[in-house]
């Protein structure tokens, strides 16, 4: 005879969603709380998730921010890049993630990626797209790009929509960049990245993903920004936080693993255990190791 599910679990027809790891000690993440963490130098942890179960497990493992990334185009849909991901797809997966968090009484901060072509035409187009993801349950939207996005960021923030910006390698423009390559390696490109980071902070961005930029440059930008938390991926350990694609950190990549990825599933007792190991490693700054995972 099977046991009835514990009251601390959210039962489904096919299993259970885990509760937050220590519900009494964890409060819902908010923008003021994330700013407080940044101000006190506490590392911010972020992972991608695309469905209810993985979102709930990540939250239970202590991950503070869940990015519903357009990377789902590559890891879930089999696309060769993120360019083909649609706003409707992002809305659907954002709803899945936030539904899972509600059912498991999760506390994570949810960020929805604005896909390619949904914010490029005008500020008004960006607002319409952002509203779709916010109504799907996102707490913040993310968009890629430098100086040309600053007025869009300002426009959204002025209308009450928190924004995470994204510099360095911007996967939506991978064709223009000539592939997945480290950015900011020259003095000129590094100076441009620093200027754009400051402009995005001034426009109101609360977070800034730095992807595949030299560790020294990422650390410099992090120190330069006083009220915009940098989140690194392939940008060394000097950023305010870290993000990885879920499938990568679980070792579910059948191709060549990117330099900045670590397989946290190796030696872990479970998926949740792997996520908890990731959180610990980011918090104690043992991941990323600049000699292994950065440039």
Curated annotation (Swiss-Prot):
<dbReference type="Pfam" id="PF02548">
    <property type="entry name" value="Pantoate_transf"/>
</dbReference>
<feature type="binding site">
    <location>
        <position position="144"/>
    </location>
    <ligand>
        <name>Mg(2+)</name>
    </ligand>
</feature>
<comment type="subunit">
    <text>Homodecamer; pentamer of dimers.</text>
</comment>
<keyword id="KW-0963">Cytoplasm</keyword>
<feature type="binding site">
    <location>
        <position position="70"/>
    </location>
    <ligand>
        <name>Mg(2+)</name>
    </ligand>
</feature>
<dbReference type="GO" id="GO:0000287">
    <property type="term" value="F:magnesium ion binding"/>
</dbReference>
<feature type="binding site">
    <location>
        <position position="113"/>
    </location>
    <ligand>
        <name>Mg(2+)</name>
    </ligand>
</feature>
<keyword id="KW-0460">Magnesium</keyword>
<dbReference type="InterPro" id="IPR015813">
    <property type="entry name" value="Pyrv/PenolPyrv_kinase-like_dom"/>
</dbReference>
<feature type="compositionally biased region" description="Polar residues">
    <location>
        <begin position="1"/>
        <end position="13"/>
    </location>
</feature>
<dbReference type="GO" id="GO:0005737">
    <property type="term" value="C:cytoplasm"/>
</dbReference>
<dbReference type="GO" id="GO:0003864">
    <property type="term" value="F:3-methyl-2-oxobutanoate hydroxymethyltransferase activity"/>
</dbReference>
<comment type="function">
    <text>Catalyzes the reversible reaction in which hydroxymethyl group from 5,10-methylenetetrahydrofolate is transferred onto alpha-ketoisovalerate to form ketopantoate.</text>
</comment>
<keyword id="KW-0566">Pantothenate biosynthesis</keyword>
<comment type="pathway">
    <text>Cofactor biosynthesis; (R)-pantothenate biosynthesis; (R)-pantoate from 3-methyl-2-oxobutanoate: step 1/2.</text>
</comment>
<feature type="region of interest" description="Disordered">
    <location>
        <begin position="1"/>
        <end position="29"/>
    </location>
</feature>
<comment type="similarity">
    <text>Belongs to the PanB family.</text>
</comment>
<dbReference type="InterPro" id="IPR003700">
    <property type="entry name" value="Pantoate_hydroxy_MeTrfase"/>
</dbReference>
<keyword id="KW-0479">Metal-binding</keyword>
<dbReference type="GO" id="GO:0015940">
    <property type="term" value="P:pantothenate biosynthetic process"/>
</dbReference>
<feature type="binding site">
    <location>
        <position position="113"/>
    </location>
    <ligand>
        <name>3-methyl-2-oxobutanoate</name>
    </ligand>
</feature>
<dbReference type="InterPro" id="IPR040442">
    <property type="entry name" value="Pyrv_kinase-like_dom_sf"/>
</dbReference>
<feature type="binding site">
    <location>
        <position position="142"/>
    </location>
    <ligand>
        <name>3-methyl-2-oxobutanoate</name>
    </ligand>
</feature>
<protein>
    <recommendedName>
        <fullName>3-methyl-2-oxobutanoate hydroxymethyltransferase</fullName>
        <ecNumber>2.1.2.11</ecNumber>
    </recommendedName>
</protein>
<feature type="binding site">
    <location>
        <begin position="70"/>
        <end position="71"/>
    </location>
    <ligand>
        <name>3-methyl-2-oxobutanoate</name>
    </ligand>
</feature>
<feature type="active site" description="Proton acceptor">
    <location>
        <position position="211"/>
    </location>
</feature>
<keyword id="KW-0808">Transferase</keyword>
């Amino acid at each position: 005879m099977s046991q009835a599910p514990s009251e601390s679990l959210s039962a489904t027809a096919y299993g259970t969603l885990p509760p937050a790891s220590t519900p009494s000690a964890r409060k819902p993440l908010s923008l003021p709380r994330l700013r407080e963490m940044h101000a006190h130098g506490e590392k911010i942890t972020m992972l991608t998730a695309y469905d209810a179960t993985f979102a709930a497990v990540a939250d239970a493992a202590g991950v503070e921010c869940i990015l519903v990334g357009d990377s789902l185009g590559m890891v879930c849909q089999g696309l060769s890049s993120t360019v083909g991901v649609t706003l409707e797809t992002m809305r659907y997966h954002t709803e899945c993630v936030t539904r899972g968090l509600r059912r498991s009484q999760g506390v994570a901060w949810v960020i929805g990626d604005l896909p390619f072509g949904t914010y490029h035409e005008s500020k008004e187009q960006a607002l319409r797209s952002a509203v779709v993801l916010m109504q799907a349950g996102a707490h913040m939207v993310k968009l890629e790009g430098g100086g040309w996005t600053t007025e869009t960021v300002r426009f959204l923030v002025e209308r009450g929509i928190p924004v995470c910006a994204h510099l360095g390698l911007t996967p939506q423009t991978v064709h223009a960049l000539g592939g997945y390559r480290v950015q900011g390696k020259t003095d000129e490109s590094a100076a441009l990245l620093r200027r754009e980071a400051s402009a995005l902070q001034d426009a109101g961005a609360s977070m800034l993903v730095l992807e595949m930029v030299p560790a020294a440059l990422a650390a410099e930008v992090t120190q330069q920004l006083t009220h915009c938390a940098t989140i690194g991926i392939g940008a060394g350990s000097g950023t305010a936080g870290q993000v990885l694609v879920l499938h990568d950190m679980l070792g579910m990549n059948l191709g060549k693993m990117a330099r900045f990825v670590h397989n946290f599933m190796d030696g872990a007792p479970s998926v949740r255990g792997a996520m908890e190991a990731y959180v610990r490693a980011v918090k104690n700054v043992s991941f990323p190791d600049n000699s292994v995972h950065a440039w």
